[in-house]
């Protein structure tokens, strides 16, 4: 199988290239917090030689509760993103939820993300594709890995081949997620070699069936991330926070920012080792 290369600035994202870290925070909480988090990621990834893309949302439009924090909104969020780019020279990924957001967001950031809950909304998919931007497609929790090929086809029909696929866990009964490690290579195959990345943070969500916010299992983030990196992936999607217990969204799944260097160092070691192996064809 040929692995496609998707270029994000000067980064080549591909399943057989050194992994790219798509890291940041769940949602923009403030300009100062974004600067602090991005600076730490840049410092760590530069030190370790890991390609890096900053991630955060300007609007968490799918929060469970009407009272939950959503973010600063598109206009303010894009200003913060532009300042991060100007200050740190980073590439940026963020999600869109509405058709009208696609064009202005794609003019500022480098990758626009199709949220898992919206991945089958054809009009939104087409609007994103027509921007020509790189698109990161989150696999819906309710969709099999094999069905991701249909979403890639929709984007390709609009003339856009710049697609990354991302697994963020699959429903396991009510209010729980598991990660099917066999699904990563299925997504590679049905997409004809698109880069596949692993959102380890959101895969750790575990909901209170009667609560308004997601719980999480950040104490298991390292073991789950190690498992995913052993597959041989194009990238890892990670959220970290200086104080996860006070984070405005998904703190229970976020890596403490103080642990970032040790964590990324381990992921790089696994990626380097796995990609040094000769591929063994066991199909015959």
From Swiss-Prot:
The family this protein is said to belong to: Belongs to the KdsA family.
A single GO cellular-component term on record: cytoplasm
Cellular compartment(s): Cytoplasm
Superkingdom per UniProt: Bacteria
Transmembrane segments: none
EC number: 2.5.1.55
One protein family per Pfam: DAHP_synth_1
Major location category of this protein: cytoplasm
Any GO BP: keto-3-deoxy-D-manno-octulosonic acid biosynthetic process
Keywords from the named record: Cytoplasm, Lipopolysaccharide biosynthesis, Transferase
Gene: kdsA
Record's catalysed reaction(s): D-arabinose 5-phosphate + phosphoenolpyruvate + H2O = 3-deoxy-alpha-D-manno-2-octulosonate-8-phosphate + phosphate
GO molecular function: 3-deoxy-8-phosphooctulonate synthase activity
Cited InterPro entries: Aldolase_TIM, DAHP1/KDSA, KDO8P_synthase
The name this protein goes by in its record: 2-dehydro-3-deoxyphosphooctonate aldolase
Record pathway: Carbohydrate biosynthesis; 3-deoxy-D-manno-octulosonate biosynthesis; 3-deoxy-D-manno-octulosonate from D-ribulose 5-phosphate: step 2/3; Bacterial outer membrane biogenesis; lipopolysaccharide biosynthesis
């Amino acid at each position: 199988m040929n692995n496609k290369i998707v270029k994000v600035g000067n980064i080549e994202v591909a399943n057989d290239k050194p992994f790219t870290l798509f890291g940041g925070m769940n949602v923009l909480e403030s300009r100062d917090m974004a600067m602090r988090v991005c600076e730490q990621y840049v410092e760590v990834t530069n030190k370790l030689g890991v390609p890096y893309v900053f991630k955060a949302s300007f609007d968490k439009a799918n929060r469970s509760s009407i009272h939950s924090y959503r973010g600063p909104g598109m206009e303010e969020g894009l200003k913060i993103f532009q300042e991060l780019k100007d200050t740190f020279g980073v590439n940026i990924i963020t999600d869109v939820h509405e058709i009208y957001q696609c064009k202005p967001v794609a003019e500022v950031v480098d990758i626009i993300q199709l949220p898992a809950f919206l991945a089958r909304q054809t009009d939104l998919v087409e609007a994103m594709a027509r921007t020509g931007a790189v698109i990161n497609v989150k696999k819906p929790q309710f969709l099999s890995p094999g069905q991701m090929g249909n979403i890639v086809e929709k984007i390709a029909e609009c003339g856009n081949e710049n697609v990354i696929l991302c697994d963020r866990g699959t429903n396991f009964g009510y209010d729980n997620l598991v990660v099917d490690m066999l699904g990563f290579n299925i997504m590679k195959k049905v997409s004809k070699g698109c880069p596949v990345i692993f959102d380890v943070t959101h895969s750790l969500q575990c909901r209170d069936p009667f609560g308004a916010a997601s719980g999480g299992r950040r104490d298991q983030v390292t073991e789950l991330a190690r498992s995913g990196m052993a597959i041989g992936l194009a990238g890892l999607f990670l959220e970290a926070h200086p104080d996860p217990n006070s984070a405005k969204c998904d703190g229970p799944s976020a890596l403490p920012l103080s642990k970032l260097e040790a964590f990324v160092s381990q992921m790089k070691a696994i990626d380097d080792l796995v990609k040094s192996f000769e591929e063994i064809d066991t199909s015959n």
